[in-house]
Amino acid sequence: MEAVLNELVSVEDLLKFERKFKSEKAAGSVSKSTQFEYAWCLVRSKYNDDIRKGLALLEELLPKGSKEEQRDYVFYLAVGNYRLKEYEKALKYVRGLLQTEPQNNQAKELERLIDKAMKKDGLVGMAIVGGMALGVAGLAGLIGLAVSKSKS
């Protein structure tokens, strides 16, 4: 599962599916499979803007898909949001998937990895906030010391 989360699309694949998508769009109608393939490539990009574009395409597909297609769309919506570190959204999608498919092992593993990332980032976030608080307290102490020395 971690390979799926960390896999990067090749430039060749991205360009190939982008051309196909734009060609169909110019002709007036993009097939669901073409839109999904392009979105899937974008979600695996190293650029956050591409990932967001891929997520928008997947969200657009969601109401149009069959139950099986929707499962794939929701899964990649979770993956894309994970890659953007939008863990709350990723969790929402993966838990929605688990409500309809409680035995889906891929979704269970993805949920576990999202929870793990949230805990890791939460601890890192708390350490940063704690460090900032210590810095502010230290600075206030130094200012207080300087003020008291200047008065004496």
Swiss-Prot record:
It holds the Pfam family Fis1_TPR_C. It is found in: Mitochondrion outer membrane; Peroxisome membrane. The modification Phosphoserine is found at residue 10. It is a single-pass membrane protein. Coiled coil: none annotated. Ubiquitinated by MARCHF5. The modification N-acetylmethionine is found at residue 1. Its main location: mitochondrion. Belongs to the FIS1 family. The C-terminus is required for mitochondrial or peroxisomal localization, while the N-terminus is necessary for mitochondrial or peroxisomal fission, localization and regulation of the interaction with DNM1L. This is Mitochondrial fission 1 protein. It comes from Bos taurus. The lineage of its organism: Eukaryota, Metazoa, Chordata, Craniata, Vertebrata. The gene is FIS1.
